[in-house]
UniProtKB/Swiss-Prot annotation:
One of its GO terms (cellular component) is membrane. Keywords: Glycoprotein, Membrane, RNA-binding, Signal, Transmembrane, Transmembrane helix. GO terms for molecular function: double-stranded RNA binding. It is a multi-pass membrane protein. Its main location: membrane. It comes from Mus musculus (Mouse). Residues 331-442, 516-541, 591-600, 648-683, 732-741, 813-827 are cytoplasmic. In vitro binds long double-stranded RNA (dsRNA) (500 and 700 base pairs), but not dsRNA shorter than 300 bp. Not involved in RNA autophagy, a process in which RNA is directly imported into lysosomes in an ATP-dependent manner, and degraded. The gene is Sidt1. This is SID1 transmembrane family member 1. Residues 375-386 have a biased composition (Low complexity). Residues 20-309, 464-494, 563-572, 622-626, 705-710, 763-791 are extracellular. Residues 1-19 form the signal peptide. It comes from the Eukaryota.
Length: 827
């Protein structure tokens, strides 16, 4: 028995010795596992660029190991392709890729969710692994990449695996790179800033608009968000159909490099496309949704271009100041010479008499109130207290009570002026105290300043919020820029679009200076009791001109605010003061020959508020709602008729609930009972043409329902303004009045500059009417100084055209300064 025990100990001694030695405990386990492994298992040293096929199930899992080496200064990436013929969504093939610091996993078929619970399945998936960076200190970096393929399918799922190295992972500068992507096969590449480049523009182009895609720029960090549901989690991104462009600055990337990610969306809804018709629930979509892309990264402009472009903008508009100063000096020299020669005021007004003389045979007896005694007309006559029915006052006395506004109802009460005279002259409609009327027109100026302050401050706050949201979220679909020519500065994404509005501010201020000079000269003439300032020419009331200058400046400010982040929500920032400018110009034209019966500032600005409200409603509801266009067209036509009635009857036709009954009576008596010639033929012709134009606009909108309602409304205002201005100039020439060289030059300059401005306006570099991706299809390169685009040139030219337009209104009747007011016809 003892011998048997000794024999057993001797047999077990080698095993005990091996167990006591460290490191020998795992060896039998490893050998045992190796014995249990399938000899065909490819996990033992898998190769790149080789296709591996296999079947995985609940009891079978395959692991592949790849040895990847990264060298200093060389960035390479690995891409994993997995394809599965299994369409069972309950038991997909699960792929897990393990790297040194990262884990990436997905399933095949890959499932994407769309709108309204729609799903899209992709049975071929390719993903790029986040590259590991080798440094000079560590030398070549070797790492193992494990690809684990598994499935919970009870009967097995077939798959194919291919792992490749990306040869062209780093994008070059100024070289186009072509590639293909799909929703389940996203792509991303690396870009490093060159040493001499501070900013770059990523330009992406595709020949076909769809499928919709997303271009994203992300910092060098893992994981890289390259799927539809997570691409918006990091970095800067924008949707794309045919074009995309992102401007980046080196200072925003600490490592001076970034990833450019390209993701194809499973649906085109975000880009303005229609829904795909999914015939088979488990259909493979890769072939249908692949997209060929071309990416080019080019250096952006340098800081010197910013400085040069800014100085260019300032000097261009400062030249207008120099030109106006030169004109003032020339005018001053000529005035001094005339004063020395004694020739000023020597004109007797011949040739300035109106062609439309009073026809006494056709007027009722005793209706010669306000008629002209031509034998006494002389520009050299002295002041008469009975002339014009008012004494002369100096404007130095500013103590005018508010009640004074309604203390002179001559025009309202003396119906003979309106009802019995066939031909009116300016003296008939300039009978109120000049100080009171001037105060009335100054309300336009003070009210527009109040409106501008209360309007601009919340606008600025809102656009700053928009810009902050864009910078924080990286969502460049919020703002509709021309991304191919959007140059950032500080927190602003498109500084060039803001700088180009400087012209409105500078030229608006210059116009205010010109009006102020004229105002001061006129006040001095009144203080000196100059006969020409008191009884000759168009009565000088500068309140509307001041309001026009402020409106021009505010148009520049609000246009700049709009271009901080132009989009669907803030379009009215840019258009509201355009309506006001057009309206003020029409009011000024009417006030020129009707100084005592013009609209009050309160009713005028209230009308502008109604117009802006209608514009907002039109943009919101006017795209598809027929009922809105019916209501708007009815309002448009009725407003045109009401305004025409007021203009024709010089404000004597009251607008109240009985207007329709009175209008029917007038129509019956004047047009049906006895068809008589209109009393005011010229006015009637203008109003008929104006109504035809406005009714045409109304029916055009009702039939075609234009999508850009804001531009449609602005077109109505501009056409009415041009029509009224053309009528005014024609009637002025028809009345044998002269047009001096300065207004002729301003008219010609206005026509030329407006034509050029409209050419650039209709280039349509972006549009918030569609999706951001559709808007980017219209983007174009810069055309001026590599800094300004076509829309910036529109800003320059439109500011200049508005300035010349204002000068036309300011100087058009300068020839009447030596003509008696009772010889200036009203039209």
């Amino acid at each position: 028995m003892l011998d048997c025990l000794r024999l057993a100990l001797l047999c077990a001694l080698p095993w005990l010795l091996r167990a006591a030695v460290p490191g020998h405990q795992e060896e039998p386990l490893a050998k045992s596992a190796e014995l249990r492994r399938d000899p065909r298992d490819p996990a033992r040293g898998a190769d790149f660029d080789r296709v591996y096929s296999g079947v995985v199930s609940l009891s079978t899992e395959n692991i592949y190991s790849f040895n990847h080496t990264s060298h200093p200064g060389q960035v390479t990436a690995v891409r994993v392709h997995v394809n599965s013929s299994s369409d069972n969504l309950d038991y997909p093939v699960l792929v897990v890729v393990r790297q040194q610091k990262e884990v990436l996993s997905w399933q095949v078929p890959l499932l994407f969710q769309g709108l309204y619970q729609r799903s899209y399945n992709y049975q071929e998936v390719s993903r790029t692994l986040c590259p590991s960076k080798a440094t000079n200190e560590t030398g070549p970096l070797e790492q193992l990449i494990f690809v684990d393929v598994a499935s919970m399918a009870p009967h097995g799922a077939h798959y194919k695996l291919l792992v490749t190295k990306i040869k062209h992972f780093q994008l070059p500068t100024n070289v186009a790179f072509y590639f293909t992507a799909s929703p389940s096969q996203p792509q991303y590449f690396l870009y490093k800033f060159p040493e001499d480049v501070d900013s770059v523009i990523i330009k992406v182009v595709s020949e076909k608009a769809y499928p919709c895609s997303v271009v994203s720029v992300q910092n060098i960090m893992c994981p890289v968000y390259d799927l539809d549901h997570n691409v918006e989690f990091n970095g800067v991104y924008q949707s794309m159909t045919k074009k995309a462009a992102i401007t980046l600055q080196k200072k925003d990337f600490p490592d001076e490099q970034f990833f450019v990610v390209f993701v194809i969306k499973p649906e085109d809804y975000a880009c303005g496309g229609s829904f795909s018709i999914q015939e088979n629930e488990n259909q493979t979509w890769n072939l249908q949704r692949s997209k060929n892309l071309k990416v080019t990264i080019v250096p952006s402009i340098k800081e010197s271009v910013y400085v040069k472009s800014s100085l260019f903008s300032i000097f261009v508009f400062l030249s207008f100041y120099l030109g106006c100063l030169l004109v003032v000096l020339v005018h001053h020299v000529r005035f001094q010479r005339k004063s020395i020669d004694g020739s000023f005021g020597s004109s007797d007004g011949s040739g300035n008499m109106a062609v439309s003389h009073p026809i006494t045979a056709s007027t009722p007896e005793g209706s010669n109130y306000g008629a002209i005694d031509e034998s006494s007309s002389s520009p050299g006559r002295q002041m008469s207290s009975s002339d014009g029915g008012q004494p002369c006052h100096s404007d130095t006395d500013s103590s005018v009570e508010e009640s004074d506004f309604d203390t002179m109802p001559d025009i309202e009460s003396d119906k003979n002026v309106i009802r019995t005279k066939m031909f009116l002259y300016l003296s008939d409609l300039s009978r109120k105290d000049r100080r009171i009327v001037s105060k009335k027109y100054k309300i336009y100026f003070w009210n527009i300043i109040t409106i501008a302050v209360f309007y601009a401050l919340p606008v600025m706050q809102l656009v700053i919020t928009y810009q902050t949201v864009v910078n924080v979220t990286g969502n460049q679909d919020i703002c509709y820029y021309n991304f191919l020519c959007a140059h950032p500065l500080g927190v602003l994404s498109a500084f060039n679009n803001i700088l180009s509005n400087l012209g409105h501010v500078l030229l608006g201020f210059l116009f205010l200076l010109i009006v102020l000079r004229r105002d001061l000269l006129h006040r001095r003439a009144l203080e000196a009791k100059d006969i020409f300032a008191m009884e000759y020419g168009i009565p000088k009331h500068f309140g509307l001109f001041y309001a026009m200058g402020i409106a021009l400046m505010m148009e520049g400010v609000l246009s700049a605010c709009y271009h901080v982040c132009p989009n669907y929500s803030n379009f009215q920032f840019d258009t509201s003061f355009m309506y006001m400018i057009a309206g003020l110009c029409m009011l000024k034209l009417y006030q020129t020959r009707h100084p005592d019966i013009n609209a009050s500032a309160y009713s005028a600005y209230a009308s502008f508020a109604v117009v802006i409200t209608l514009t907002v409603l039109g943009v919101v509801f006017g795209k598809n709602d027929v009922w809105f266009w019916i209501i708007f067209s009815a309002i448009h036509i009725l407003s045109s008729l009401a305004l025409s009635t007021q203009i024709y009857y010089m404000g004597r036709f009251k607008i109240d609930l009985g207007i329709f009954r009175r209008a029917a009576m007038v129509f019956y008596t004047d047009c049906i009972q006895q068809c008589s010639r209109p009393l005011y033929m010229d006015r009637m012709v203008l109003l008929i043409v104006g109504n035809l134009v406005n009714w045409s606009f109304a029916f055009f909108g009702l039939i075609y329902r234009p999508r850009d309602f804001a531009s449609y409304m602005l077109g109505i205002f501009i056409c009415n303004l041009l029509l009224y201005l053309a009528f005014y100039i024609i009637m002025k020439l028809r009345s044998s009045e002269k047009v001096l060289p300065l207004p002729v030059f301003c008219i010609a300059a206005t026509a030329v500059v407006w034509a050029a401005a409209l050419y650039f306006f209709f280039q349509n570099l972006s549009s918030w009417e569609g999706t951001p991706a559709e808007s980017r299809e219209k983007n174009r390169e810069c055309v001026l100084l590599d800094f300004f685009d076509d829309h910036d040139i529109w800003h320059f030219l439109s500011a200049t055209a508005l300035f010349f337009s204002f000068l036309v209104l300011l100087t058009l009747d300068d020839d009447l300064d030596v003509v008696r007011r009772d010889q200036i016809p009203v039209f």
